[in-house]
């Protein structure tokens, strides 16, 4: 109760606590304030695993709508809800950080799509420069016909000018993943990318989420992420 739960059966211990960082705002477009809260889970080891949880206001009662794992011992500085999205300002572990001491400044954005809380955007500040992936076309929720092209831009080109991409259905089913090349004047300079998709052979219609990711070559973590949400006909 009171935002905390724990159990100890003599062999195993487990506790979960709602942290004192949260936000109120409309997440589903019904004009009523919902909530975003941060939960920390402790299974008795050294880890402290945090998640962001979307909570709908359903006829005045809180109903958990979706949850996304943030990681072990990340530091959530602030939570905000605007434009039906959850925005987090956090410190995550960089490649050389011990788990106890995160120092990588990130901003993360989450959307509730169907019944899943999706990470839609991540930016990181590395060496004083912000790594961002901006989708320039098409617009979010746009109707597209196979084949369709997604374009984007980055202010700082990734290692070897390579971005990964992942295609998902709104229920979390992964359709495909691969990589693409960024066109730029060299690593660390601004760049652009363009990728054409054709999902007709997979028989996929309806909404799909395509995530473009800059991956750390040091530890495989996400440095930047940009997403396109399109309705495929």
What is the meaning of each model-derived region?
Residues 1-24, 120-124:
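Terminal domain-start segments
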Residues 2, 47-68, 110-114:
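Beta-propeller blade repeat segments, especially FG-GAP/WD-type strand-to-loop junctions
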Residues 7, 77-136, 153-155, 166, ...:
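Acidic, small-residue rich beta-repeat scaffolds with periodic aromatic anchors
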Residues 16, 132-233:
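Ser/Thr-rich low-complexity repeats and stalk/linker segments
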Residues 29-39, 84-89:
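Acidic/hydrophobic-patterned starts of short beta strands in beta-sheet-rich repeat architectures
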